[in-house]
Amino acid sequence: MANKLTQPKGSISKETNKEAIARLFGIKKTAVGYISTSVLIDPYTILYDESTETCWYRGTATGTPISWIITNGSLTLQTTSGQFALIKTQVDINLRQEITGEVGYSNIGKVSSVTSLRSIEPTTNGQQIILNQINSTLGTTTGGIFCYDSSDVTSIDDGYTVIVTATGKRWKRPENYIDMAWFGALNPAVDFSDAWDAAVAIVSNYVSNVGFYGRKAIYLKAGTYKPSRQLDIPSYVSVVAIGNVTIDGSGMPDNSYVIRIINKVSGISTTYHKGWNLGSIGGTFRVLGNTLDGNVDGIFVGNTSNMSDVRNVILYGVSIGGVRYGLTFGSINTYLFTATDCHIESTIIGIYVPNTTSSNSGERMTFNDCTIGGSRTNHIQISQPGFDVNFTNCSFDFTSGNVFYGTSTWGYSKVSFTSCHMEGYNGLLLSAESPQSSSVGSNRSIIMNNITNLSRLRSNTTGTNSSSRLHIDAKSTPVYINGLDQRHEVTPYLEDCLMCSDETILYINGYIKDPYFQLPSNTMILNKGYNMGDEVVGTVVNSTATLDALTRYTCVDRNAMSATVITGGTAGTQLQVTGAGGYFNLATKSFIPVTVKNRLGLYLSLSALDSTGNIQCTFSVAWYDVNDNLISTSSASSINMRTVFNDTTLPNYSDGNSRYIATPSRTFNAPVGAVKCKPRWQVSGFTGNINVSRMVSFILAG
């Protein structure tokens, strides 16, 4: 039995066996027959004995078999016409060894092309056949197994996945996905753009003619692919990278997107699409352009005309880089977008939403666990009205411009950041142009929750990670911050320590973990006259009798020092303090209301002028109850501003002692029972003159 031809059992397999035997002998299937007591053997050349799984030459034997026996490699056959001795075929002797050997699979025959496959009529449901290639142009990577589906009488012959014979029978690929290799994607002689378009067309046509459910995803094997032109995909088609896939768009024409997710037909419901439009399994779906200075953009999502809604688009594990605009959004019927675990880097603008004709767009655009880095101009730039975007657990790393930038046409919109990390921007954290109209400005807002901001410049210039640096200039735009880890690492080197511009409407709560606290907004300053503007020029504080001579402040104590209110020209009204190593201590005349939830911040700004010695600055707060009784006094360690003026690493060191520099802020928590307070500012230790231009108390958080 060692030389038997092993074949599957059952009636369904008989025709398949005949086909296989016919190919081995180079004869027609009709020349192969089974030895059976009910079948006339005269029409056949090769006889197959099913019980021993062996093949025999019929020779001159005729008639219908009655009985047969195999002895010593010979078959004695008794038929209605007599007794005959049949010779065993040589192929039968060698076949088992060839098929079960290491290269046995290569001995199985294949259909040469789709054209040939159309001429082969299947006979049994589930019958399989191997196609060598779609055609010689696309190559052998396009081949594969096809199965006969007798239940299908409607599928269209698409030339790749469904092949229809002359009698209407359908050979179909059994896979539950579409492999872009079937369209020539792995053949370097084939334009990848053609392979992409052909694969996408099959799925798109299925959705158009049959419906979304039942449509297959397109798989793209690991490798690098170089399309010659823009790749388009409807929002209801999925392309999934298996492993690391790179779409190299460096050879594309100017003003192309490497990939556009766009609908070109109307009337297709995209309501229930929830699959990845672009995604990756076990790797990254990488999209490359022709460098930042080229004119090729990354991915476009949206409609440019009134077509089927581009909704529920999902990007997963997609990386975009080396392009002008990383991810661009359209503005017609484009909404409910999600990007997860994606990366956008080395762009002019990372996420770009231009101002075009807008209709039914911008609802719940979401980014989760994404990184946007290396943007030359801005990480995010929005001009389109009505674009609501949410960033959660995202990182924004290094840009020569702003993290977020809203133009004058941006409005009717909310942008939110939750648990995000910002680092290394040369411009601003948040920037917005003045709105085109008051209605636009009043309908836009920015919300930030649990944010970490390491604000050093992309160029990492010394001093730029300082609390002197403005971070927010969102003109007429409310900014709500709840939880900010602002990591300034450099002392102030300018007169003011403002987080936002005067034109920004800022609400902040939970400002934490910063050794150099900023004044969030001028609206949070508690003491009127913080810039000495209310004081009378010429007022002298130099004796016990005149300790209370200032308008807004009381000199509560002094030693070997006196002060005079002077005019500083463009620098404004100032308090010039003259000392000989003593101290000078001012407090507000009026009480400042507080609650136990308040954290009070204090700083002062000064110019060192001709002074020598240490310039010690100390802050304290006297807390009072509802009946004006002193509860306690909180003090902070002193700050030697001489070391700041002598710091050669600060950007404005060359301006010398004429600079006005703010002290680092000191903060105090109101004790239980406190309902009001009087902040105190003290300077001491120097000889000569200094000018004080700011004495600020502010609510840091509430």
Curated annotation (Swiss-Prot):
GO cellular component term of the entry, any: virus tail
Keyword Membrane among record annotations: no
Protein name per its UniProtKB record: Depolymerase, capsule K11-specific
InterPro entries named in the record: Pectin_lyase_fold/virulence
Gene3D superfamilies documented for this protein: 3.30.2020.50
Phylogenetic placement of the source organism: Viruses, Duplodnaviria, Heunggongvirae, Uroviricota, Caudoviricetes
Assigned keywords, A-Z: Degradation of host capsule during virus entry, Degradation of host cell envelope components during virus entry, Host-virus interaction, Viral attachment to host adhesion receptor, Viral attachment to host cell, Viral tail protein, Virion, Virus entry into host cell
Domain of life from the UniProt record: Viruses
Compartment(s) of residence: Virion
Gene Ontology biological process terms in this record: adhesion receptor-mediated virion attachment to host cell; symbiont entry into host cell via disruption of host cell envelope; symbiont entry into host cell via disruption of host cell glycocalyx
Function: Functions as a receptor binding protein (RBP) and probably mediates the attachment to the host capsular exopolysaccharides. Displays a depolymerase activity that specifically degrades the K11-type polysaccharides of Klebsiella pneumoniae capsule.
